[in-house]
């Protein structure tokens, strides 16, 4: 396995992360990227994204509040990412409820590129063609067969797939990881999943083994959440403490404290 200094390598480069994301959590995504050591840019005008992706280190596309303008921008940005060798992270927020989002993902896969798909377990199982239980943008799934869903979807799109829930699962189609860190308080803060997608973009920007970089991003969020909850047990203060702990997170801490099973 590649050297696991994922966070160190990311912070040495201060990668520029181009985000086309939803209006609910855009500020949180920008702030957590800054705290993590990356440089966020929330550029989504369709006549600007092609050029901006060309100077970016990674592209993060979040489909949470997808407008037609964002759809056009996301497709154009993915084409630029393919042409300029920029990794792309997709967060298929709410795809079981709004089927148009699946069409957008398939279009991006067809004309652009996808390196990582990060969703909750319900979204990932839905995209993999498996039965899943969701409510709006939330997963009600218990996680059964989640790693199998990740593996199937990773093979379909030839990318890394991460499914988050009580346990988190990551697969590249052959290898996998199961992460057992975290706190339930992460489910009480709007946008924790969106912020995680942004972290996945940051860690993959300058790290070749994207299974490891994605696992590191999830560990960073989960362990920062655990530490935040030690000091802040209410949602508002927890959200602030989460971003503070992301600022302080390190490779040594995530791999020492992390409860990861490699498959």
From Swiss-Prot:
Substrate binds at residues 42, 191. Its EC number is 2.7.1.50. InterPro entries: Hyethyz_kinase, Ribokinase-like. GO terms for molecular function: ATP binding; hydroxyethylthiazole kinase activity; magnesium ion binding. Keywords: ATP-binding, Kinase, Magnesium, Metal-binding, Nucleotide-binding, Thiamine biosynthesis, Transferase. Its cofactor is Mg(2+). It catalyses: 5-(2-hydroxyethyl)-4-methylthiazole + ATP = 4-methyl-5-(2-phosphooxyethyl)-thiazole + ADP + H(+). SUPFAM superfamilies: Ribokinase-like (SSF53613). CDD domains: THZ_kinase (cd01170). Disulfide bonds: none annotated. ATP binds at residues 118, 164. Pathway: Cofactor biosynthesis; thiamine diphosphate biosynthesis; 4-methyl-5-(2-phosphoethyl)-thiazole from 5-(2-hydroxyethyl)-4-methylthiazole: step 1/1. Catalyzes the phosphorylation of the hydroxyl group of 4-methyl-5-beta-hydroxyethylthiazole (THZ). This is Hydroxyethylthiazole kinase 1. It comes from Clostridium botulinum (strain Okra / Type B1).
């Amino acid at each position: 396995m590649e050297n696991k200094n994922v966070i160190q390598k990311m912070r040495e480069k201060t990668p520029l992360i181009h985000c086309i994301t939803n209006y609910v959590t855009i500020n949180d995504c920008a702030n957590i990227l800054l705290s993590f050591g990356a440089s966020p840019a929330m550029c989504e005008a369709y006549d600007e994204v092609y050029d901006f992706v060309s100077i970016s280190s990674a592209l993060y596309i979040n489909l949470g509040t997808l407008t037609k303008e964002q759809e056009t921008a996301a497709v154009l940005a993915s084409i630029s990412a393919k042409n300029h060798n920029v990794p792309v992270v997709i967060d298929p927020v709410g795809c079981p409820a709004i089927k148009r989002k699946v069409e957008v993902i398939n279009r991006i896969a067809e004309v652009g590129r996808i390196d990582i798909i990060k969703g909750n377990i319900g979204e990932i199982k839905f995209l993999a063609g498996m039965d899943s239980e969701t409510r709006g943008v939330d997963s009600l799934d218990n996680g059964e067969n989640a790693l199998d869903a990740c593996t199937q979807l990773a093979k379909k799109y030839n990318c890394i797939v991460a499914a988050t829930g009580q346990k988190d699962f990551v697969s590249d189609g052959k290898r996998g990881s199961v992460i057992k860190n975290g706190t339930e308080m992460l489910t009480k803060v709007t946008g924790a999943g969106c912020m995680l997608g942004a972290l996945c973009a940051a860690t993959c920007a300058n790290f070749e083994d994207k299974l490891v970089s994605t696992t590191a991003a999830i560990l960073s969020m989960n362990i920062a959440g655990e530490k935040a909850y030690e000091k802040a047990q209410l949602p508002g203060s927890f959200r602030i403490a989460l971003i503070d702990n992301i600022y302080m997170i390190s490779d040594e801490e995530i791999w020492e404290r992390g409860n990861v099973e490699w498959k």
